Amino acid sequence: LITDWLNCNEWNMLVCCSDMIGTRTEGMKENALPLRQTDAAASGHDLAAEKLLHPDAMGVLVPGRDKHFYSSGAFNLIQLIFYILRQTGPAHLLLTTYSISMDSIAAIHRKVETGELLSVRFLIDNRVRSISPKPFDYLVTTFPDCYRCLALHAKVALLYNEDWKITVVGSQNATHNPKLERGIIHTGRDIFDFDFKMLNDEFDSGTT
């Protein structure tokens, strides 16, 4: 029965160890870490070989290839978003987070003022209102029509413009994260559309 179950669910595995290729990615930035690359035809995933100390270590984003990484807590979700913006150019942001800091809100606001972020919407957990009242009040004041509250634990960032449709999914919040964190940068339109529909609907039904 176990064998039958494994056979039936084999298609659902994202990456098989036997498919791994130990080649290094060429043409990356000088400060980027080597990536272990799966068979592009099979999966289209780049796996960071080491824990990242800075988003730049991920190298250049390539449409159709996803990046999987662990970070040592040296950067948070907002810093990762800004790294991506340097490659996409001005883009819209839809962000979900379980917690957010005043520094992160201020940094996002600066990007809006400079035009690097074309628009911003936030989905945040209901408990931010009571657990982090100062950041919540700052968010309400700075982005009065751009946030919604709901019961939420997902950490997702959608960045999009005419050329890019990017989904970031991981364990990082929009706060300082001095812990081991896991993340994935999806560059496929299908993943983006899936997340955008879900989160857009949640925004429409959320509260202020």
Language model regions located:
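PLD/PLD-like phosphodiesterase catalytic module centered on the HKD motif
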Residues: 2-208
